[in-house]
Amino acid sequence: MAWTEKDVENGKESESLGNNGFLKGGQSSSGSKGSPGRISHVKKIFEDKDAITYANILRSRNKFVDALAIYESVLEKDSKSIESLIGKGICLQMQNTGRLAFESFSEAIKVDPQNACALTHCGILYKDEGRLVEAAESYEKALKADPSYTPAAECLAIVLTDIGTSLKLAGNTQEGIQKYYEAIKIDSHYAPAYYNLGVVYSEMMQYDMALNCYEKAALERPMYAEAYCNMGVIFKNRGDLESAIACYERCLAVSPNFEIAKNNMAIALTDLGTKVKLEGDINQGVAYYKKALCYNWHYADAMYNLGVAYGEMLKFDMAIVFYELAFHFNPHCAEACNNLGVIYKDRDNLDKAVECYQLALSIKPNFSQSLNNLGVVYTVQGKMDAAASMIEKAIIANPTYAEAYNNLGVLYRDAGNISLAIEAYEQCLKIDPDSRNAGQNRLLAMNYINEGTDDKLYEAHRDWGRRFMKLYPQYTSWDNSKVPERPLVIGYVSPDYFTHSVSYFIEAPLAHHDYTNYKVVVYSSVVKADAKTNRFRDKVMKKGGLWRDIYGIDEKKVSSMIREDKVDIMVELTGHTANNKLGTMACRPAPVQVTWIGYPNTTGLPTIDYRITDAMADPPNAKQKHVEELVRLPNSFLCYTPSPEAGPVCPAPALSNGFVTFGSFNNLAKITPKVLKVWARILSAVPHSRLIVKCKPFCCDSVRQRFLSILEQLGLEPQRVDLLPLILLNHDHMQAYSLMDISLDTFPYAGTTTTCESLYMGVPCVTMGGSVHAHNVGVSLLKTVGLENLVARNEDEYVESAIQLASDVTSLSNLRMSLRELMSKSPLCDGAKFTRNIESIYRSMWRRYCDGDVPSLRRMELLQQQQTQTESVVPEESSVNPSERTITSAPTDGSIKENGFTAVPALALKSSTSEENGVQSNHNGNHGNLS
């Protein structure tokens, strides 16, 4: 046979060699077990015996050349010396001369055919050449010669295991398994046979069998690192992360530098971090993620999940660091790029956000979350065509992507197409009936077209409130002492304590409350604080109030905070607009609960006692229904604090232009076709007059063209209309009122902040009353200022009032220059008096509570009775009314289901758009199955 000269494998077989180079337990020529190669039946002279002993010593010291010379000298005298032939073969084997070694062992076998030692060495040489079958046959002959010869059994177990692995790799799995079992039968203590059986059973997904085999392998060889590693993989895949980590720890205790085990440990620790974080222990989750990086410092998934965790902890600088590290070590991690975009978007760095989303899409072109988020940014920027394209692509990529439909609804709403917006919200709700965003945005959108001709909008709010309330546990008792005239604690919760519409109407109470008798606790969920936020905080703290930053905190936890602060009357200022805390109000943490300012309709929540309004916005004889009990202030329900950045009132532009300019800075959703029809009548009746309209979507050409086309169809030439996009700086926005002479209010959803701004800048506003609160806000504002003559009862009066104002430019100019003073001296800007009035209302509410008169408790008891009566009736056929569907899962809280980020359009009354943050963790990695 042809031999290849090579090194003898330093593997399992060589470990069976004794200190003298012979296989442990070498055989005598008779086949009986004794000293290796010793021939007892042949008398040798003392010198030969001494020479062989010396040669064995030399060989044990790896002096194979010298030992070989002595063996050969002995063989010259006695060519049948078994011990010398075997010693010679071993020396040749160690010198990589396999052919000569084989000849020497063969000569020994010729002398003694039953010599197990020589047969075993021949088997080793066969195995070195990859001739596993011949090796096995040689080992079997050795065992047949001496069944108790352990080295042969060990070597046979090794080669049978190798044969089994070869068969398995060739696709003959069952034959491979058979060979492993044959190996175990030959040597029941051979750990690799058990281990490789474990690998096969793992691949066959017979994990109980695999685990049993790995355990036996580890039992036979306690230092078997690979067995511990693969046991860890099985436990990890079963979700038993603690057991998996324990196995990896044992593995690494045996082999500290075992890279696969270190990587697997990092994977398991990352999974465990995500598990405990989802269970509520985010700090422990972070600790596990960091520990994972100790085992694999470039493990991108641990870095990504640290980014997610720090984002949830509102430590956004840290989140950015770990998202960037995750992307650095895994350039295919689109989720990290996406989440970076969310953070930059929330920081108003829209260009950077777009860059991140586009990078994510370059990695995953159909990544629905980034497509959606890019659409959100474009919507915020007013780029409606680009936004629609992105969101539609997100829906194509994932047709069941509910929140994309919600965001499409926001886009349609911003573009002024309310019917399409409502359709999109309803499509979202078909996919995800529990979508809080879509449910609330739908209610908000319905206000833009509701004229109070029926109760549909009330019923929609009521039904939403009843379903939503079931998601939260309600408190029904409080420790607050029922002393009617004691000092009260008033809580205000809002996300809008920054330069935002609501902030102009909450500033007066924060500044003028009698903190001795009405201590203020502010719960601020502001996404991005600004100078106004800081001013509010300083003012409240200086007067002895409390300021709680609650952004990102679970609504139930906020409820607990409110109870700990002993709040007596809790006032929410947001309604169904973005980032609201209606979930907190649903828990009913305070004895008395109130809604005010932020939303022009009922919340629908049975847990809220009162809604603050006035007799002008909600006349006592109005037919509009509310879930809450209405409480009316003596003047307007609003108190306006002008912006210090407003600047001076400019002269009427009509004086220099020679024509009158009408205008509106309301959002496009309020400017319905019906409104445009009335405005067209006005401009047609006032020669040479112009119209100026400013809103965010006008930076989009298609929106501009659509708007002008509608006016042209109504008889108004496009050349008479000026369209302005969003103006970012507040000072510049206020100065833009210098471009108009007369402000035209919208209906049936009137302006609020825009009306106050126009009046403060000297621009009179024409408004029209109606049958619902949203329609009458302008009525409340103008009457409070003393401009009742600008309040119309119908469209004809509205047109006539505008025409009359425009007909006398001198009077218009005089009114303009006196309007700010008139407004400033009116109750609308008298913060001290307004606050005394609202404190009086709070005191009345508290007295009613002390007397046991609690509207929400009565309402909830009635609902409980109705539910009990309904459940006691067994219908003939069971059916489910979608409008009465009971929601059993937690709401998304205006955010993505995994990570809680929300995009907020910067509008007076705003819709919630959802941004997605990718998956919590990516569990890819080498599972460590070694064979």
UniProtKB/Swiss-Prot annotation:
It comes from the Eukaryota. The keyword rRNA processing does not apply. Its EC number is 2.4.1.255. GO terms for molecular function: peptide-O-fucosyltransferase activity; protein O-acetylglucosaminyltransferase activity. Residues 1-15 have a biased composition (Basic and acidic residues). One of its GO terms (cellular component) is cytoplasm. Residues 25-37, 864-884 have a biased composition (Low complexity). PANTHER family: PROTEIN O-GLCNAC TRANSFERASE, UDP-N-ACETYLGLUCOSAMINE--PEPTIDE N-ACETYLGLUCOSAMINYLTRANSFERASE SPINDLY-RELATED. This is Probable UDP-N-acetylglucosamine--peptide N-acetylglucosaminyltransferase SPINDLY. It comes from Solanum lycopersicum.
